[in-house]
Amino acid sequence: MATDDGSFPWTQESILSRDLLSALSPQLCYENLNRSCVRSPYSPGSRLILYAVFGFGAVLAVCGNLLVMTSILHFRQLHSPANFLVASLACADLLVGLTVMPFSMVRSVEGCWYFGDSYCKLHSCFDISFCSSSLLHLCFISVDRHIAVSDPLIYPTRFTASVSGKYITFSWLLSIIYGFSLIYTGASEAGLEDLVSALTCVGGCQVAVNQSWVFINFLLFLVPALVMMTVYSKIFLIAKQQAQNMEKMSKQTARASDSYKDRVAKRERKAAKTLGIAVAAFLLSWLPYFVDSIIDAFLGFITPTYVYEILAWIAYYNSAMNPLIYAFFYPWFRKAIKLIVTGKILKENSSTINLFPE
């Protein structure tokens, strides 16, 4: 439509200028709201790739750990105190994949939180609680493996279902109490009120943690990590000594087959090796994140956002690693997966199927 002087209000140059300004101006999480957070400046192609990578991790964490839990709980051969501890660990990792990773995925890719302030706090509680629970489970599993390898014949009387239940209960209760109290009491933000106020925007969900609690978090990671490394160092020394003793005995006596004690010791060493790899994967996944948290807290939050997101997702991906480790090292787990996927566990008496090679 022409103006009074016969000219058009929108020329080609003005349209191009408007489009250029629109392209250069930052996109907001909520365009029509004041103090809206700014969206991440990723291209559509980059967003698609990130969603695929992060989404794959979440699906793998849920499906893989669900297979671990189903295998252990369904097949009677796997009903042991140690395996119940492993199933509980899988439950913690499953919950990370179910309640934490999908929402963190959207926040990481979009730079926005679309799930409300209430779930923002709850999401942070789930994040801290379930990841802490994984750490404590792995710590107790290392203690279990040490007992099993050091004295495999007495082990069944020392690590009973009651002991396993106490370990599981402690791991869950302590983690949940710690995670929820840290977030809902506001203890983590004490002394950071001005910073929190300055950074608060609509569509954001970042929990501020002061130096004291960052240091406490690091210690809560470091102490169990040192315990696990110490215990597994002892385990491998014992395993090496046992292997040397068995080799000497095999040279001295022409045995047609291994003794029962040797077979048990061999099986426990293999289990310790597999779970030791799971522990190493956990430590390697989470150590960079905790080190960065310490650096950030004491040097003024200098870590670029994309670096923080990379470290966080390396840590999250650990929740998907354990099922892959079990599938690689445990033939019984591969057989259990096949039975579950093909639906054979729905048949009568499927729980009594022999999963171990003769």
Curated annotation (Swiss-Prot):
Disulfide bonds join 37-201, 120-205. One of its GO terms (molecular function) is trace-amine receptor activity. Its main location: membrane. The chain crosses the membrane at residues 48-68, 84-104, 124-143, 167-187, 213-233, 275-295, 310-333. Glycans are attached at residues 34, 210. It comes from the Eukaryota. Residues 1-47, 105-123, 188-212, 296-309 are extracellular. It is a multi-pass membrane protein. It is found in: Cell membrane. GO terms for biological process: G protein-coupled receptor signaling pathway. Olfactory receptor specific for N,N-dimethylalkylamines trace amines. Trace amine compounds are enriched in animal body fluids and act on trace amine-associated receptors (TAARs) to elicit both intraspecific and interspecific innate behaviors. Ligand-binding causes a conformation change that triggers signaling via G(s)-class of G alpha proteins (GNAL or GNAS). This is Trace amine-associated receptor 7g. It comes from Rattus norvegicus. The gene is Taar7g.
